[in-house]
Amino acid sequence: MRNSGSSCSESVGPPLWLLAELTYRCPLQCPYCSNPLEFAREGAELSTAEWIEVFRQARELGAAQLGFSGGEPLLRQDLAELIEAGRGLGFYTNLITSGIGLDEARLARFAEAGLDHVQISFQAADEEVNNLLAGSRKAFAQKLAMARAVKAHGYPMVLNFVTHRHNIDNIERIIQLCIELEADYVELATCQFYGWAALNRAGLLPTRAQLERAERITAEYRQRLAAEGNPCKLIFVTPDYYEERPKACMGGWASVFLDITPDGTALPCHSARQLPVQFPNVREHSLRHIWYESFGFNRYRGDAWMPEPCRSCEEKERDHGGCRCQAFLLTGDADATDPVCAKSARHDLILAARRQAEEAPLGLDALTWRNQRASRLICKA
């Protein structure tokens, strides 16, 4: 891509957090995956040397944290080499994984390479539900074993549970499992509706009552853990669909976060690829050009792009106009006011989604599972 935007390098700070989406390959088929629906048409993955060059350039720009994700990053056989390269450049390194494909030997190798942090995701605290959502009969047992192994290797125990209408009522058991595993940090993250989660929203969005109950139970456990002197930290993330003001996505468009997809496409957030905006590729441009000069990264910086009521809103410095990806998904217009905002002319779309969660939700059997076959069908359509 040739740059068609204008430079705003004088007012833009450096990227601080680099996310390396090493691959879209994954042994699981979670129906709420944030990967693009059309991942089956993804081009060739960056090579080891290409990834290391990305790390070098990002570090030169000022990035300090390097996350390895996917898909499932463990499917990259060069992962230890990439960790070692990132750590050698001075990054704080973080592995975001399902734990499927991890074993004691690889964990020891990652420790030798300098990995700082491991986050393991669970689909549920119930083995049957976890395995159903993961699409693997062995997933739950493997995750438990690897969570314990991560703790034994001296890493902070960081667990992530994506919650939705089919598992959120078991929030107490989820928290109890985290305590049993001696987790240091637990992210109880209700589905954010992008990628496959957006496709399956009618079967995943909890009701307001479900959310309020889960949040209350989480708060009770926080108090109990604090009283017992237990260091476990519980982080509860609500979906935008029950808010009246939008989030400041990633702290503002292309202000802190830089995502590189498996084929080298650079994005200002995980979901931006779905937008009608052309984004640059690291195989064609330097990260410096991409971050400071490219049209895609400058498209929604600042507030000149904002329509009313955002442009004259006193809250625009706080939420930066909300999420561009969410606006596009719901309205078909990436420039539109985020419908989550009660001031939006399309807030009715959010109200309709809430009503659907109450009146006509879909069951687990109606979900579209994230896998190659489903992605190929979507690509054909």
Swiss-Prot record:
Query: What GO biological process term is on the record, naming one?
Result: pyrroloquinoline quinone biosynthetic process
One GO MF term attached to the UniProt entry = 4 iron, 4 sulfur cluster binding
Q: Which Pfam families match?
A: Fer4_12 (PF13353), Radical_SAM (PF04055), SPASM (PF13186)
Entry keyword annotation includes 4Fe-4S: yes
Q: Which cofactor does it need?
A: [4Fe-4S] cluster
- This protein's UniProt keywords: 4Fe-4S, Iron, Iron-sulfur, Metal-binding, Oxidoreductase, PQQ biosynthesis, S-adenosyl-L-methionine
Q: Which PROSITE patterns match?
A: MOAA_NIFB_PQQE, RADICAL_SAM
Q: Which residues form the Radical SAM core domain?
A: 12-228
EC class, as a word, reads oxidoreductase
Reaction catalyzed: [PQQ precursor protein] + S-adenosyl-L-methionine = E-Y cross-linked-[PQQ precursor protein] + 5'-deoxyadenosine + L-methionine + H(+)
Per the entry, the cofactor note is: Binds 1 [4Fe-4S] cluster. The cluster is coordinated with 3 cysteines and an exchangeable S-adenosyl-L-methionine.
Reported EC number(s) for this entry are 1.21.98.4
**According to its UniProt record, in which pathway does this protein act?**
Cofactor biosynthesis; pyrroloquinoline quinone biosynthesis
Q: Which InterPro entries match?
A: 4Fe4S-binding_SPASM_dom (IPR023885), Aldolase_TIM (IPR013785), Elp3/MiaA/NifB-like_rSAM (IPR006638), MoaA_NifB_PqqE_Fe-S-bd_CS (IPR000385), PQQ_synth_PqqE_bac (IPR011843), PqqE-like (IPR017200), Radical_SAM_PqqE_MftC-like (IPR050377), rSAM (IPR007197)
* Binding positions for [4Fe-4S] cluster per the UniProt entry: C26, C30, C33
Q: Which SUPFAM superfamilies match?
A: Radical SAM enzymes
Q: What superkingdom heads the lineage?
A: Bacteria
Q: What does this protein do?
A: Catalyzes the cross-linking of a glutamate residue and a tyrosine residue in the PqqA protein as part of the biosynthesis of pyrroloquinoline quinone (PQQ).
Q: How does it assemble?
A: Interacts with PqqD. The interaction is necessary for activity of PqqE.
Recorded family membership: Belongs to the radical SAM superfamily. PqqE family.
- The name on file for this protein is PqqA peptide cyclase
